[in-house]
């Protein structure tokens, strides 16, 4: 537990920042929720019971969950039937016998992208696709048409602390967010041997995003898409809205293409020279994310 999240949590924060830079409308909604929940309070004034639950039920929690859905740290989880007895699984009313010592590989990335278990709509990223199951859409986690609970301060995380040495027994999401069927959302595995540090990881993720987005915005760097190599900032400053939107669209397309190359070496991450350059800017000084995709 001392080093919990050193690799996995850091990767999820990284992926979440890139996704939010690639999807400015989601980032703006997240910042509105952060402002509503935290006001002007400094991090040292935040309270675990009220602040964490409110963040979990907001666009912050939805963004964390959506990142975990699309980019789970561990894409494949090994399981094994007890060596002492067979096990019977009841799936959709049918019983399936698993012989003792059977090795099972649970493919997290597949079940979490199965449209059978998730709210979907036609893709805004690729209009030719009937489903946005492959897209980063945090709003799918809200049960009321893309809006969070009316009072974020009174949000609950049902079962959040029902954790013992036998494994966390509660759900992975806020009581106010969409609840996929058991087994459809398993970034922390499931059952008696699920991740003991899941609640710690969730708090770390929520806090990291809240600290960043209360003061800053994340934008995709567009340097590689500005013609010429000199005076890039000056060229961008001289562009009109239509040109800026086209420039940022190129960065968005590149970001999605690079993110699709993520692969596993112990955990899921970008490797070799694959990376998505971003800019950290103070809120109010954005060039793109304050208005790009306003119709989303």
Per-region residue spans from a language model:
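Central I-helix of cytochrome P450 enzymes
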Residues: 1-33, 67, 103-105, 205
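A structural signal for well-ordered alpha-helical segments within the folded catalytic domains
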Residues: 11, 15, 58-65, 179-186, ...
């Amino acid at each position: 537990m001392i080093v919990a999240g050193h690799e996995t949590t850091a990767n999820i924060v990284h992926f979440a920042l890139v996704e939010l830079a690639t999807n400015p409308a989601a980032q703006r909604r997240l910042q509105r929720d952060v402002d509503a929940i935290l006001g002007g309070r400094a991090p040292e004034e935040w309270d675990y019971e009220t602040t964490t639950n409110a963040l979990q039920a907001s666009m912050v929690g939805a963004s964390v969950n959506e990142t975990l859905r699309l980019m789970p740290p561990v894409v494949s989880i090994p399981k094994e039937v007890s060596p002492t007895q067979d096990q019977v699984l009841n799936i959709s009313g049918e019983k399936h016998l698993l012989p003792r010592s059977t090795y099972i590989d649970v493919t997290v990335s597949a079940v979490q992208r199965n449209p059978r278990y998730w709210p979907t709509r036609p893709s805004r990223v690729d209009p030719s696709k009937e489903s946005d199951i492959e897209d980063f859409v945090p709003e799918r986690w809200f049960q009321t048409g893309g809006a969070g609970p009316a009072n974020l301060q009174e949000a609950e995380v049902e079962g959040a602390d029902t954790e013992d040495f036998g494994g966390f027994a509660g759900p992975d999401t806020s009581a106010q967010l969409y609840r996929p069927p058991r087994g459809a959302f398993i970034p922390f595995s499931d059952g008696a041997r699920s991740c003991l540090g899941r609640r710690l990881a969730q708090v770390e993720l929520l806090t990291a995003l809240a600290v960043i987005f209360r003061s800053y915005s994340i934008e995709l760097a567009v340097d590689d898409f500005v013609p010429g190599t000199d005076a890039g900032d000056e060229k961008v400053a001289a562009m009109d809205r239509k040109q800026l939107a086209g420039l940022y669209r190129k960065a968005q397309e590149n970001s999605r293409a690079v993110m699709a190359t993520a692969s596993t070496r112990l955990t899921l991450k970008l490797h070799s020279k694959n990376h998505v350059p971003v800019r950290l800017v103070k809120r109010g000084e954005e060039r793109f994310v304050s208005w790009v995709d306003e119709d989303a």
